[in-house]
A protein has these predicted regions:
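Conserved acidic residues
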Residues: 88
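A conserved beta-strand element that flanks and buttresses the S-adenosyl-L-methionine
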Residues: 91
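Short catalytic micro-motifs in class I SAM-dependent methyltransferases
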Residues: 94-98
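Class I (Rossmann-like) S-adenosyl-L-methionine-dependent methyltransferase catalytic domain
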Residues: 1-85, 99-185
């Protein structure tokens, strides 16, 4: 699979930049078969939720992580997902850029804002010079300022550029933004 790195170095570095505690409630949106949940479990995170539209992807990750880890696996489209809890950190590497319809983006951002009332977000999308399609689907591309503008209730702590190289050798530039929720005044 080409859509996630074998080692999620940038995401983990941003967890550190945000100072995410090991007992924080973390949701990985679109996590599917990615290795992030494996690394978080190995680093001692104990309150993890992985949401993905693909049950097959979730099963691959579940099989790797095993039953010992306390991970909630949720098969759902993030646009219709109605979580019944709050999270300290929302992580998304590569779902948001597939949302090319303004109404879909608004629904996604409304859910994010609702379920992260005091925490943080790590949002990663294709960079402005990234591909304009992925897996045959159109994508939106963002720079750090554009992502920050979409998150007015959050303050950017760190922004990074990362280049993912697919198994086929194709370079895909990403923009990562780590932002903390601003306290209401």
């Amino acid at each position: 699979m080409s859509w996630f790195p074998s080692e999620p170095h940038t995401s983990l570095a941003l967890f550190d930049a945000l100072g995410v505690h090991r007992d924080a409630a973390v949701v990985d949106v679109g996590g599917g078969a990615s290795a992030l949940v494996d690394r978080l479990v190995a680093h001692g995170y104990v309150d993890l939720t992985v949401v993905d539209i693909s049950e097959v992807g979730l099963d691959l990750a579940r099989d790797r992580v095993g039953d010992a880890a306390k991970v909630e696996w949720v098969v759902s489209d993030v646009l219709t997902w109605a979580p019944d809890r709050r999270y300290d950190l929302w992580h998304d590497r590569a779902v948001f850029h597939f949302l090319t319809d303004p109404d879909d983006r608004a629904a996604y951002l409304a859910t994010l804002t609702e379920v992260v009332p005091t925490g943080a977000v790590i949002l990663a999308t294709f960079a402005p010079d990234g591909p304009d399609t992925c897996s045959g689907l159109p994508v939106a591309r963002y720079g750090p300022d554009e992502l920050a503008d979409l998150l007015p209730d959050f303050e950017v702590v760190e922004a990074r550029r990362d280049v993912h190289v697919t198994p086929g050798g194709v370079e895909q530039p990403f923009t990562f933004v780590a932002a903390r929720r601003v306290a209401a005044t």
